[in-house]
Amino acid sequence: MKKSLIALTLAALPVAATADVTLYGAIKAGVQTYRSVEHTDGKVSKVETGSEIADFGSKIGFKGQEDLGNGLKAVWQLEQGASVAGTNTGWGNKQSFVGLKGGFGTIRAGSLNSPLKNTDANVNAWESGKFTGNVLEISGMAKREHRYLSVRYDSPEFAGFSGSVQYAPKDNSGSNGESYHVGLNYQNSGFFAQYAGLFQRYGEGTKKIEYEHQVYSIPSLFVEKLQVHRLVGGYDNNALYVSVAAQQQDAKLYGARRANSHNSQTEVAATAAYRFGNVTPRVSYAHGFKGTVDSADHDNTYDQVVVGAEYDFSKRTSALVSAGWLQEGKGADKIVSTASAVVLRHKF
């Protein structure tokens, strides 16, 4: 009996050496407060306030790889939200995939982040709860950042350069909503630059609604030939961090009422931080210019400031204190929102 157990153990050793599985995740919870004041014709027309204990993006995941020989590996990941507020359900509701990795690069299929979403860490360095995302995060530019049921290829890095291409079929993206994505990256001696592009035939998203006996994808009703271009650049030496970002959206609107219309939307953002021992203070500013892809006349003008600091208790446990101010519109018609949060985070 003992010999059989020893034989089984020895037989399992090569398998354990070539197939690695990692459990990982993060628990993030804290207290947040928010206040929103809407002005109409120069007068206060609506006030909303609140405070709550909230989840700030907790998650849990499993990932692994298997050595297939000749430098080829099978890679996989299954990740899902794990809210401490008990509001996340289901498996694989975050980035989840299976693929192959080798000297040629990595190819994956599944629910994959787009190149736009991959640049988010250098655009939005903040975290928020359910009701404060528009104030405590640089969320205006992030509206086009999504995860797609798609296939994606990422190249190996060469002389600091790397790239990616991604395709989401129309049957996974709503009515005629197939999309194409491209990403280019460069890093050298702390300097970095990123480009991310999205090209979509009709709108974006996976939900549909019926309007005047026609079915449309939402949230981008009537949007045709959507393009999103984002440039990000900066410097990071593990103490000083600076980044700037610019995003241009462009679309043609379809439908009898909006024939031949063509609109664009431009937004910019910047972030600076410096690490003093265990403390890292940070500040971000974002601005949106007039006009959106849905309407050239829509006043999308906004200004936003987020300030805060992180304190590292250890490599895995940290705290974040932040406060944000957002003004949408200007003059007599505007919405002014403020929010603050204290968050405790642990990664495993």
UniProtKB/Swiss-Prot annotation:
Residue intervals passing through the bilayer: none
How does the UniProt record describe the way this protein sits in the membrane? Multi-pass membrane protein
State what protein this is by name: Major outer membrane protein P.IB
Q: Name one GO molecular function term.
A: porin activity
Q: How does it assemble?
A: Homotrimer.
The principal localisation class reads membrane
Keywords from the UniProt entry: Cell outer membrane, Ion transport, Membrane, Porin, Signal, Transmembrane, Transmembrane beta strand, Transport
Q: What does the similarity note say? A: Belongs to the Gram-negative porin family.
Originating organism: Neisseria gonorrhoeae
Query: Which BP terms does GO give this entry?
Result: monoatomic ion transmembrane transport
- What gene is behind this protein? porB
- Give the Gene3D superfamilies listed for this entry: Porin (2.40.160.10)
Task: Name the Pfam families for this protein.
Answer: Porin_1 (PF00267)
